[in-house]
């Protein structure tokens, strides 16, 4: 049981074991509860020795009490155990835990009343502030005020939200102001779930505590009366000091601020944790070529906060690195500001510099100065008849830039009509005379739409326009002669026009997103035929009239008209293309997100596969249209990258759809953080008075792609029979199917919606990809006005919201759901009825059923999923089992009647009810009012091969709790089909296993129950079976059997078995042959783990047999003993089953290894290598050494540097100076004790080091001895470069600093073997260099440095040979081409082949097809030589 079982002895132990865990319960306290409590106290950084006295228990209760409200169940259990133990110490008679808690509460109330009475007697005049943890009470004593749950809650929230970002440190400092070590430990305990971070923090505290003990040696002899002892490092950390001692130290005269000291240690540890969680160095923060200066400054200062440096060093970083790492544009401006410029001046000066807009402005200014001749050439290439117009700013009137890039103050009034009171975007004149022959405004009065601007690849807004066609337009004035001004309309409002159809005038919407023209009821002559078309509300029936004449603003067309119940008249693309109307799609003006390939990778170079003629024609048409809209651009042969494309027909359509196979590019593209981790759920929506659902049209094609990345999206449309070279394109916008598109689009959309959300807090916007749900409690008129405002806001940024998918009335179709004003459901689900099912069909069926299960209770898919087991092709035929057919029929019946869910009401409580369906399947409903489900679901996951219902029930509850936190932000109250007694039994034995929230019993059959129970203590009088099994890995033969305490034994032979199966077989044998009560002893942790979890079913047949035997028994006790430790029965049965099965391994090197470890304290890797020991044995030798358990092993060989680099530093031990040199690449150490820390001694040591090893660079700190003239002279003479670390930054000397600690640790292990420190230092150097193995290559440091130096020499020699080889050139022939190619560079020459490099391509050429000649250079070639003749040719 361990040392902690001795907390209670004699009569007190008897009293302890009589106290019940719960009122009326069967279980009572045991010694194991004391052992558990002592381990828990160690985990919470409390001294377990405090359990031995009543006062100690009081201290523990005071420490734990503030955490009871916010703490876990474990803290509450610990508090209950300590309170009961306190009553036993005080000899207060209690029957159970509840009575003990009541007694403790009475005692605490009495003491509290006494304190309050004393405070009242003292009067108000002497009251002091209650804002600090240590305050003065009424008697003038300094008492501790416990840290509040509110403070703890704030600290936990900071850690959970910020995840150890730099902001955590100042927050911790603020929250822990004036705190005692006890308070600080309580704060750390509340975030104990972050195990890795807490372990790092613990290591730092231990190091600092050890350093404190070294700097403050303990006073020898007894303390004088009345004098308090000096605190040790562990006292400051609160592990060996009481709260009263901490208060005395903090309030003494002179005070010892143990709280502040401990806080400083914790902050040191937090700094290390922050560095781990924010691994980017300040040196790596550089401004991108297109990154705005503001964003660069944000990143710089965020990283600066994480740097472990003083304020002076951070100031130096800000002054130098901020300017040094800016991009060239910003750097020029910043240097012009001079030294000492404030951050405000820098940001003002660099505003607008560095981003794409700045580049565009500079380019525009450069182009405006281009010569007229060059401009004329460009005009001819672009098919323009006249000279280009220079762009002119509406705001300041200057040429060379646009108004949106203008830096001058904004001119008042409208830029379109000149009137004040509104801006151009709100101008009412902009829609006048749509599609007229002349533009609305005269030359010079407003913005002129030049043909140049219409042709740009990145227009700023979508504009339908008429192509040059039958009726050319008049010229727009003298200045614009030769240039065509096309009529156009900006889509600030819906493009409604008057059209003439069959002599009737009607108003219709120009809709480039619609394939067909659809009109409301209109009488048309001629015959018609019926047709069904798809719309947003489902399918509608229409009448189709062919060859109908239509006139739009004087333009005539003839085509098909559909007449039916459409909400608005639509002129579709079938008519718009005839009159030459095109749509200029906007590319959003927001800044592009920079994208890169993964390091070391190049773009895709996948060849285009052959395509059929119809697919090539379809792709040509699609790409022509995309090019006109600016989505793609043609490219030349200079782009070496390619991605294959293909085409498929749209569902239920004759139209084609272009698909690009971006799999190869996706592999090579950098990874993106998934902006949205899941889809929003309608059960989490709050009921709203007004709702609208919008869809963003051509979502990805509205966001620009990073210009530098566009080249990697290149693709080719081939020609039939290779008639002509393929036409090459690249994307200008986010492509469909590329891995970065979703993340970049979501990020861009969030930034665009942010200002609208801030200005309209009453509007709730759910955004997922291109679907927007907008809800509010406004009246419908106000709500729709806000929706139009939102649509206009999106349009400014280039995102359209088509009317076709603008849903104003319920039911709303959103994210696969159907939303009604007071309820929701999934969109109608039709299960297919097939004669034969393929794997793909079953996969789709299971997907549909899983989707339906969130609102239809009782859906099951277990047997359908079993049909998919194994590696099967998608087209394989699967025959349904009888169980799967029954499951499918039940699901059809469930889906027959529609089921609805309701919306969430924050004022009401959430309730979750769980039912067991059988066959490891569970269903649940989450609701606030009975029979009105918010959401339903199912659970059919099996956590392990061996399980039981109680364990599965806890998994179901945890799934529901997680789901509820995601959707509603809180956990529901649970109603579970399990009796309290069953849960109590499980909880008593397995209380560490899981957590469960508040719940109540519901009598809904089938109830969950435990089928058998293992005893916790041996059964007196029952026979004891020692069981064991063994198997041979090669032959798969094995034995299993048992030996009993009464002399019985049985051994059986097994075939095709394993060690684990044999161990289980032995237990099954013992259960089979034993009586109703039995004790079983095994040495298998595997078997023990399976059976102790009390499974009632398993996937393994053998385990099912064991379960059947267990259910039949009245009592079973199962115990474990370690193998091969000479334990009686276990040793006997082990010999019986091992005979002829196990191979015996004689470890005769153990004694020698132990002897060497006692002398050198070498690590386990060195012993395993030198003495041929298994790692587990070598680790056991280290573990049993008391001197090697101070701290874990240091890691070596983690840094990869040049062979000649050494780091030097001086460290102090026992009042003496040790100079240490570390070879960075290998970790090899040279060290010695020097008489003084002077430049002369340091220079002498450097010369000794250079005489032993090749030293090219030494890296030191800025100490006076290292910066002295003597060291500089020594370095100059030995031709050594000296480098210095960053001031006050220990990380710059990280290797030697860590080696200093390692060296001191080894010295501590061997110090008692040496009389003088200098001897111990050399012993420690020897041990480190030759007796510790690990790191790169698994060598010792001595072996590694020799290997590195030898490799360096070989590499240099090889490099010389390579250099000689590279002086030769190779002419070669390919297998099919008889022409000699070259000259190529010779990389390697072998017996049968040569390796060459030709135009960056490396090739292997057979020796017989290569001619090798020396490259003498052209300067040696005369007129008559071969080189000269070749040049002439």
Swiss-Prot record:
A motif (Nuclear localization signal) lies at residues 26-32. The record marks 985, 998 as: Essential for RT p66/p51 heterodimerization. The modification Phosphotyrosine is found at residue 132. GO terms for cellular component: host cell; host cell nucleus; host cell plasma membrane; host multivesicular body; membrane; viral nucleocapsid; virion membrane. Residues 277-363 are annotated as: Dimerization/Multimerization of capsid protein p24. Residues 1199-1349 form the Integrase catalytic domain. Mg(2+) 2 binds at residues 1028, 1063, 1083, 1134. A motif (Nuclear export signal) lies at residues 16-22. Residues 487-491, 535-541, 574-586 are annotated as: Dimerization of protease. Residues 73-77 are annotated as: Interaction with membrane phosphatidylinositol 4,5-bisphosphate. A motif (Tryptophan repeat motif) lies at residues 983-999. InterPro entries: Aspartic_peptidase_AS (IPR001969), DNA/RNA_pol_sf (IPR043502), Gag_p24_C (IPR045345), Integrase-like_N (IPR017856), Integrase_C_dom_sf_retrovir (IPR036862), Integrase_C_retrovir (IPR001037), Integrase_cat-core (IPR001584), Integrase_Zn-bd_dom_N (IPR003308). Its cofactor is Mg(2+). A zinc finger (Integrase-type) spans 1148-1189. Residues 1019-1142 form the RNase H type-1 domain. A zinc finger (CCHC-type) spans 391-408, 412-429. Keywords: Activation of host caspases by virus, AIDS, Aspartyl protease, Capsid protein, DNA integration, DNA recombination, DNA-binding, DNA-directed DNA polymerase, Endonuclease, Eukaryotic host gene expression shutoff by virus, Eukaryotic host translation shutoff by virus, Host cell membrane, Host cytoplasm, Host endosome, Host gene expression shutoff by virus, Host membrane, Host nucleus, Host-virus interaction, Hydrolase, Lipid-binding, Lipoprotein, Magnesium, Membrane, Metal-binding, Modulation of host cell apoptosis by virus, Multifunctional enzyme, Myristate, Nuclease, Nucleotidyltransferase, Phosphoprotein, Protease, Repeat, RNA-binding, RNA-directed DNA polymerase, Transferase, Viral genome integration, Viral nucleoprotein, Viral penetration into host nucleus, Viral release from host cell, Virion, Virion maturation, Virus entry into host cell, Zinc, Zinc-finger. Residues 445-455 have a biased composition (Basic and acidic residues). Residues 8-43 are annotated as: Interaction with host CALM1. It catalyses: Specific for a P1 residue that is hydrophobic, and P1' variable, but often Pro; Endohydrolysis of RNA in RNA/DNA hybrids. Three different cleavage modes: 1. sequence-specific internal cleavage of RNA. Human immunodeficiency virus type 1 and Moloney murine leukemia virus enzymes prefer to cleave the RNA strand one nucleotide away from the RNA-DNA junction. 2. RNA 5'-end directed cleavage 13-19 nucleotides from the RNA end. 3. DNA 3'-end directed cleavage 15-20 nucleotides away from the primer terminus; 3'-end directed exonucleolytic cleavage of viral RNA-DNA hybrid; DNA(n) + a 2'-deoxyribonucleoside 5'-triphosphate = DNA(n+1) + diphosphate. It comes from the Viruses. Zn(2+) binds at residues 1157, 1161, 1185, 1188. Residues 7-31 are annotated as: Interaction with Gp41. Residues 445-481 are annotated as: Disordered. The keyword NAD does not apply. This is Gag-Pol polyprotein. It comes from Human immunodeficiency virus type 1 group M subtype G (isolate SE6165) (HIV-1).
